[in-house]
Amino acid sequence: GVTFSGGRPSFALWAPTAQAVTLLTWETGDPLGSVPDVPGPPRRTPAVRHDDGRWVIDSRPDPPAATGASEAGGAPDQNQPGSPITAGCQYLWEVRVYVPSTLQVETNIVTDPYSVALTTDSTRSVAVDLADPHLSPEQWAETPAPAVRNDSARSIYELHLRDFSAADETVPPELRGTYRAFTVAGSAGVRHLAELAQAGMNTIHLLPTFDIATIPEHRGSQRSPRIPAGAHPASADQQAAVAEVADDDAYNWGYDPLHWGAPEGSYATEGHQDGGARVVEFREMVGALHDLGLQVVLDQVYNHTAACGQDPRSVLDQVVPGYYHRLDAVGRVTSSTCCANTATEHALCERLMVDSVVRWVRWYRVDGFRFDLMGHHPRTVMEHVRAALDELTMEADGVDGRSVYLYGEGWNFG
């Protein structure tokens, strides 16, 4: 992933079987990276392989270019060697690696599995420093999470983020179906949550809000079904209308993960889907729910990915083919989850899971997790999740990790 030192990003990708790895970057001029895809070719920076399988690009600038100017003349070009890679840049990894499913060496261009932020529709990762104070809305920063005295006193309300406000006419149209709908104090939905909190409800369980693979993130690209006015209640017209726009509508429960550690862009307001802008809006939601007296639990789906192999919606398998997914006796990806099963029993797959859970607590201040199909994960993995959270302290991290509530879907298979 990306880390920061002195405001400068460094990059690392674990790809032990790769023959070569190159970082592709586009400078945005915005430390928060809240801009659409930057046009033009990227700057190419070869990564250095370490003995542990990581390919690394540190935060130090390249040696100065001989001329200090772009080939076309004029001011220095930040996409040319000699200029540092800066906070807010957009980036992709180019990985040259042997792919068993195609029996040849492929050159894959992929987003970062550890992405903290993304451009709209997840076309590029964005190097955002989650510690940047400009990403900290006041209510989120200053409102502590409410306490739940013990787990037996917990009352949980499961809620789909978009459904909460998509049809609520008391919410401004531009905020409907978004993170920021929770900040509209006078809306019908927020008033209802406040009343429930007064009655004793203390926890909101949000259906998946990580980066989802199949929801168009541009509002203008989303289609809604048009039900014929004269359709009989028992006709097939309604189903046909829904099926016609199924690939382009905004309705999705969200159980098709693309990036586990970044917020979903379709739930951001229009014009705020890129980079750090969606981070701010997610935090605004958490702050507003805390202010209502409600803890926030995230529904996390680590048991499968949206795709595998060379599929365009496959990230992990294009970086380390055959590692992140659970295979059967002949090498095929298993799908008992109804999708491509992950192999969290593998050390670096487990670490990706653990690290993203810690990120959501430390940098978004969520209060718990519900794990989808938890039985598909080894017990030791869940114990490691618990142990990693328990290490977070108010003094060092601003949160008490021991108070984070964990539970999982209890189906006994996998």
Predicted features, each with a name:
Residues 22-24:
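Beta-strand signatures of extracellular beta-sandwich domains
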Residues 404-414:
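Polar, glycine-rich mid-to-C-terminal structural blocks
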Residues 162-167, 171-183, 191-364, 373-374, ...:
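Substrate-binding/active-site clefts of carbohydrate-active enzymes
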Residues 14-20:
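Short proline/glycine-enriched turn/loop motifs at strand-loop junctions of beta-rich domains
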Residues 1-6, 33, 37-43, 52-54, ...:
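The feature marks proteins involved in alpha-glucan
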Residues 7-11:
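Structural beta-strand segments of beta-rich domains
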